[in-house]
């Protein structure tokens, strides 16, 4: 997890990059949970490394920063298009409720809330 819950501790970038390199060499996927990344004071995401590491998958959720527990709404980022197609093929037909979709749209319109929260 990056940052860790409940401590908020972040992995050192050099350590994380080393893990990514070793896993890349061994053809191992790395799933990085960044659901709490918006609470960090400065940019600490590794999202800019997606194009370098096709084995990197980043998971984020709306539920943490927008304080909407129970609303199952999140997303995954990955640069491996073939893998994304495989993942999409495993999703249920109705993987997003109408309520969660409406909540997500409303959240994306609340930039002022984000500034106040962080």
Task: Please give the residue ranges for each predicted region.
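Active-site pre-lysine segment of PLP-dependent enzymes
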Residues: 6-65
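PLP-dependent aminotransferase class I/II
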Residues: 55-118
């Amino acid at each position: 997890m990056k940052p860790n819950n409940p401590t908020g501790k972040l992995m050192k970038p050099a350590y994380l990059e080393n893990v990514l390199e070793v896993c890349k060499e061994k053809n191992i996927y790395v799933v990085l949970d960044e659901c709490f990344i918006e609470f960090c004071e400065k940019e600490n995401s590794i999202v800019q490394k997606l194009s370098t590491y096709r084995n990197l998958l980043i998971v984020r959720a709306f539920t943490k920063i927008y304080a909407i527990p129970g609303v199952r709404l999140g997303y995954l980022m990955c640069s491996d298009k073939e893998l994304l197609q495989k993942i999409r093929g495993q999703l249920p037909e109705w993987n997003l409720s109408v309520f969660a979709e409406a909540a997500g749209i409303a959240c994306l319109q609340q930039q002022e809330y984000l500034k106040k929260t962080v």
